[in-house]
């Protein structure tokens, strides 16, 4: 809900008079989407609840509220402080600073201007916080092992198709493993598992060299506001050596890569040393004292040993 406040100069006729709000055409931050409204409902809280609203409609940037002059509805008198609650207003798709470029105009029933002002301020729109965050890596929290990882969170704001989920993995600057969490390919398979109904989004994954995995939403489903989401990452590889628990940060963005929610952090597991398995042996071809010959060392790895500099 949003509250629109203003004071009239001239009277707005109670039968067919109108209040028009023209919202900003653009913002310096260039969000993909500016203010929109989905079937707005308008009620006056001042000067009185019986000001009377016949209809409210939103088209492109303009909210038009038409007064209802029937019965005891009073309309808007001259020199009166007014406040009206507007429901179903969607804020811009990413963070924007306040601007004073909105316009309020009141008209008579013939759509002729009564009052107008062009310096109405909108709010600062700030990043929301993701909640219920969690991250799990491969089933065995062991160095060098790859497997199915899961990231889960609940959105604050909606992410439209073409928007992104950006996951930044820890640097592990204290332990300095050869690599941190990574994918063996640049385009890991990502799959939303929650929600599981027809609103489930689809996405592609990109994980080039570095610590950042980016999901770009595709198809026709958005990430809805205030909804739990979870997605899996195929073959995410744990860091190359033992590391302490750290944090992974998740941010949602609109299609212009501008921040919507986050970044919000959650813990990564401690990555432990694996236990060498299989048949462990060191067998020589000659088994008598003092003889130089070949030996065969046999074992099975748990985690991957990096091909460049691994030991």
Regions found by a protein language model. Give the residues of each.
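Ser/Thr/Pro/Gly-rich, low-complexity intrinsically disordered stalk/linker tracts of secreted
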Residues: 1-311
């Amino acid at each position: 809900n949003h509250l629109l406040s203003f004071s009239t100069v001239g009277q707005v006729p109670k039968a067919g008079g109108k209040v028009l709000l023209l919202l900003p055409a653009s913002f310096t931050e260039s969000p993909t989407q500016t203010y929109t409204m989905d079937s707005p409902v308008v009620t006056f809280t001042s000067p009185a609840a019986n000001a009377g609203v016949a209809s409210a409609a939103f088209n492109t940037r303009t909210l038009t509220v038409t007064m209802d002059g029937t019965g005891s509805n009073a309309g808007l008198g001259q020199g009166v402080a007014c406040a009206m609650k507007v429901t179903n207003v969607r804020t811009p798709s990413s963070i924007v600073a306040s601007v004073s470029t909105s316009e309020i105009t009141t008209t008579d029933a013939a759509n002729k201007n009564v009052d107008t002002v062009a310096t109405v301020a909108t709010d600062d729109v700030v990043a929301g916080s993701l909640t219920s965050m969690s991250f799990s890596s491969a089933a065995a929290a062991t160095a060098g092992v790859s497997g199915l990882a899961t990231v889960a969170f609940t959105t604050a704001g909606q992410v439209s198709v073409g928007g992104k989920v950006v996951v930044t993995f820890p640097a592990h600057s204290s332990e300095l493993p050869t690599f941190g969490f990574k994918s063996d390919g640049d385009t890991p398979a990502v799959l939303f598992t929650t929600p599981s109904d027809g609103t489930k989004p689809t996405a592609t994954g990109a994980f080039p060299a570095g610590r950042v995995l980016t999901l770009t939403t595709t198809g026709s489903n958005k990430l809805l506001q205030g909804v739990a989401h979870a997605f899996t990452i195929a073959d995410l590889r744990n860091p190359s050596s033992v590391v302490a628990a750290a944090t992974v940060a998740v941010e949602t963005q609109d299609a212009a890569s501008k921040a919507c929610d986050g970044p919000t952090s959650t813990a990564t597991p401690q990555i432990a040393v694996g236990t060498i398995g299989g048949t462990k042996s060191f067998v020589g071809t000659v088994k008598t004292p003092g003889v130089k010959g070949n030996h065969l060392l046999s074992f099975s790895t748990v985690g991957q040993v990096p091909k460049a500099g691994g030991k």
